């Protein structure tokens, strides 16, 4: 009998426990309870459910089965390579199949009564020399099992061979039950589950099909025609798996609880909490408030809330259930029977109405832009989504709608990057600059997001951009950089700042109010200008020199906030800053470039007469907004000053026929006149932008401003920090459209997608071999070049792979982390341990086969 203390030895890898789990014999323990307990502990040591996610555990199981079903001639060769995941194993087999010149032999197999000749690969010579031990062939049948049960198909696992009427309760040790997978939970509930392994669309079951003891009627499910569409367009209908696993935001959860507190939903769920029709109606009601959820997601979320509620009731800290009060009202049957005439009464009774209440009815509110919305003041909160503080409501306003914010659904990193890239396109940039609350335009943005696989409503897109603006202003006001992870993208998109040449009429225009604007309004505008946040341009304008005598003007900020237009001009005091040596160099270059502008510039058309700036234009009776009220003689001057506001780029760099704004042209000229003007004083490396130099300087200074609050690890770059955070949150925002597999990095998704397309963009020029991963390609290139960049600091020996260097370094340190569980012998390489384990496997095989 194996000692339990041996299971807790440190330094053993999961492969050892996997082999022990698979080769476990019932005869080694005293009875069934000990056998089950031993298998449980071995399985947990192998799969490590406390560390790995469900997807990772499933991948380990599938990888093991995949290696088992491989042809015997290549199985040992693949196992010799020690693939860490299924994707790597598939790639190894594909590379082996496509390797030219490999001899093949034909094999005749019978498929449905017909003989088919297949080609069988011959494995490498190295793999033929390995000892082939098929685990399945040596596994003995447990004693006490009837012959009828032994005669079952070997393809059936232990779960399939069990009586379907028997349900195995989760085995609990130390108070921690082993978590069920989502698939098992759905099967136990009797729901159909059809895995989408080949990327096909969701399969629909025929009417009246049987799933276990439950009969599924297709006519009970709402048809696609009856489902409400966001903008009455068919392409908004998505399959369930497209939105599965999306994080539930705070406002979205409160909306769900407010809906469930209504009488019809509360009574129905109290009688039958698994009623799919009720959850379907809840999902439809959520959709009315801008949250796209399936009935299964609503049911799963409510089950999760119930679980956290029970934890608090059993003595866990209150933080375990953030919605304890709302759940207390529902679970304790304290919800008063309310009329079902609207969600507002239920929400107000449950205390769920938050700071985001509006004065519009949901049925009256559409996606189309209303004229009154331009004049409305949309309160922008500086708090995050988890803020519980309520904003006082206007007592004279109409009955509030619960939870205006439809942007509560979490936006992933790649989704936000795609969203900002779409907004930076010319057609959206120009249109949103003129009217940032155009709902039809946000509908087009949402449609473009849909093309990239992200499902969003127009209102969610608008709310997200407002949130990005808020976090951007926080950083500009001096808060920590991690407040706005997309600061650089927002800085390039939001700010438009002009260093204009001296102009007599310009100062007068900046200081005097426009005709049609009262002195009180002008004073109010000046006060708003003093309070406005200082914005940067898209070309690192913090480094830009202001020529002597120039007047600083700032065009209205792109996509103004709903309160009104931002400050029109810079405060003089804000221009006094500490400037580094790099900034001084930038100043000199810009001053030099400005003197050379006439040689390179080509004056384009400048007769725009439609400026949307609320500071420069007045709204007079009988005239539309945007009509000029200044004297006609100053029209050309005003237009020349308003080109940045209009987004016009009248200056063309003749060398490349590329158009720019005034400041962008100066920056572009600097890039041609002086290549990479920002030089690192430590290593001499040069950069084209000061921001890139600042990031590079952190390598020398060791500065890591982005610190993880969970584990304390620090990072130099915000992008690496965001990627690291997903380790703690478990977020995997990048989903494969073919198989549904999720990843926490976009690069991992791109590499994975190449396994479906067969694309291998990295081709070796020496031998012609192709790779789907740049790292594998780089390692292969070193075979031809002889490059060995990884040097041992102790003996100076070089290696082409970092893994080889780590294994070599253990020869100096004496570290042997891989220990044999049977004899205690330790090894510095996992491959050596695997080969050593085959010796014990052979010994056990001989012992079992020896006559007694």
UniProtKB/Swiss-Prot annotation:
Where found in the cell? Nucleus
Q: What is its main location?
A: nucleus
Q: Where is the composition biased (Polar residues)?
A: 508-517
Work out whether the entry's keyword set contains Ubl conjugation: yes
- According to the UniProt entry, which residues carry Phosphoserine? 153, 561
What gene is behind this protein? ZSCAN29
Q: In residue numbers, where are the C2H2-type zinc fingers?
A: 678-700, 706-728, 734-756, 762-784, 790-812, 818-840
The GO terms this record gives for MF are: DNA-binding transcription factor activity, RNA polymerase II-specific; RNA polymerase II cis-regulatory region sequence-specific DNA binding; sequence-specific double-stranded DNA binding; zinc ion binding
Which Gene3D superfamilies does its entry note?
Classic Zinc Finger, DNA breaking-rejoining enzymes, Homeodomain-like
Q: Which UniProt keywords apply?
A: DNA-binding, Isopeptide bond, Metal-binding, Nucleus, Phosphoprotein, Repeat, Transcription, Transcription regulation, Ubl conjugation, Zinc, Zinc-finger
Spell out the GO cellular component terms annotated for this protein, sorted alphabetically and separated by semicolons: nucleus
Which InterPro entries would you find in this protein's record?
Myb_DNA-bind_4, SCAN_dom, SCAN_sf, Znf_C2H2_sf, Znf_C2H2_type
Q: What is this protein's function per UniProt? A: May be involved in transcriptional regulation.
Family, as annotated: Belongs to the krueppel C2H2-type zinc-finger protein family.
Protein name in the entry: Zinc finger and SCAN domain-containing protein 29
